[in-house]
């Protein structure tokens, strides 16, 4: 096959073999040729500052030499075994040491898979079926997760709205939807429904911050109504702090999911909880009826584990998170100055380590208020 060099030719080839022309729903309209540090280059050689960082995994930048060295050291020893391996065990130990709610973990390949198993685990542990999630919260591509992620029409809470074709109608009956940052709505739903297994939440929902006391309130309500609290830390884990949102906000869930950074740029995710909850993965303890089957071809593979271990080691070094926050503050200030100078109304929402710009004058407290953003900008 001819070695094509121009970006337009590569885009045409992509459109021929991929539905909608890309790997997923997100298509930036460029073809990335390589990355180094905080920059990526397209097939035409154009240099971009990469604020996407692979949607989160590349927090250290592209091609970090220590991560490359760790991967190259593991490669000749084996790439995957479908069995326990030393690197996977070491990574699990590092996660248990770092993340407050984790006494034990299970590895999977993607964050969406981790969230799917977290929901299933909550149901197995409690014997209940319903899940409360927040409108606009992203938890992967499972049927439950694709409820009220990005609804185009507003319906009355707590009605769930599917965001994708192919989801059986019965799934919505097992989901309750609440607005983010609304403890009163959550308490009302808990009081009116005795079949709720868990509340699943992003501690920082996309880039909408939790209002002061909201996460603490969720924890208290879950304790009062004997409902499990799941933190989806696929994005926030090892990013807001080394111990993730749990360390940063001082709130410990019952179950959490992790991904992105823990794989160091390779496919790897995990879910973790107390040993009491995680025992449902052990048939010898809970028996067949309460056992949760879970396995995956590449789960815990040593290449991803080696990359993740080295990434976590680097992040744990003194000054890593203070530098990350200083950089984030500087970027926020520069963005605000530029937009204010142009007379453009805006809000910078999120955390110093993870943020975005909304072109609106009102506060962003939940999905519906964020929708007031001007998409044309």
Segments the model singles out, each with a brief description of its role:
Residues 1-377:
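Conserved N-terminal phosphate-binding loop of PLP-dependent enzymes in the Aspartate aminotransferase
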């Amino acid at each position: 096959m001819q070695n094509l060099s121009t970006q337009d030719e590569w885009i045409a080839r992509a459109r021929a073999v991929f539905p909608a022309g890309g790997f997923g729903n997100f298509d930036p309209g460029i073809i990335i040729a390589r990355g180094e540090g905080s920059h990526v280059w397209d097939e035409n050689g154009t240099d971009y500052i990469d604020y996407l960082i692979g949607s989160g995994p590349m927090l250290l930048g592209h091609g970090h030499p220590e991560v490359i060295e760790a991967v190259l050291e593991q490669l000749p020893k084996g790439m995957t075994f479908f069995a326990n391996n030393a690197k996977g065990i070491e990574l699990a130990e590092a996660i248990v040491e770092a993340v407050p709610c984790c006494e034990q973990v299970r590895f999977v390949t993607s964050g969406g898979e981790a969230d799917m198993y977290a929901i299933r685990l909550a149901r197995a542990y409690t014997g209940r079926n319903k899940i409360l999630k927040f409108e606009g919260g992203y938890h992967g591509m499972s049927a439950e997760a694709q409820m009220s992620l990005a609804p185009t029409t507003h319906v009355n809470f707590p009605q769930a709205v599917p965001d994708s074709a192919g989801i059986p109608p019965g799934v919505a009956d097992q989901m309750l939807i609440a607005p983010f940052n609304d403890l009163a709505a959550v308490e009302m739903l808990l009081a009116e429904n005795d079949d709720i297994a868990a509340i699943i939440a992003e501690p920082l929902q996309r880039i909408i911050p939790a209002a002061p006391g909201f996460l603490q309130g969720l924890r208290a309500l879950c304790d009062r109504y004997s409902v499990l609290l799941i933190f989806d830390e696929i994005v926030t884990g090892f990013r807001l702090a080394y111990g993730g949102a749990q360390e940063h906000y001082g709130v410990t869930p019952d179950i959490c999911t992790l991904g992105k950074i823990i794989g160091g740029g390779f496919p790897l995710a995990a879910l973790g909880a107390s040993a009491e909850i995680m025992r449902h993965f052990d048939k010898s303890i809970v028996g067949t009826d309460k056992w949760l089957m879970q396995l995956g071809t590449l789960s815990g593979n040593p290449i991803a584990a080696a990359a993740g271990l080295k990434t976590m080691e680097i992040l744990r070094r003194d000054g890593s998170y203070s530098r990350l926050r200083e950089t984030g503050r500087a970027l926020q200030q520069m963005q605000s100055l530029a937009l204010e100078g142009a007379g453009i109304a805006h809000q910078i929402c999120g955390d110093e380590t993870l943020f975005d710009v909304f072109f609106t004058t009102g506060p962003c407290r939940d999905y519906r208020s964020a929708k007031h953003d001007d998409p044309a900008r």
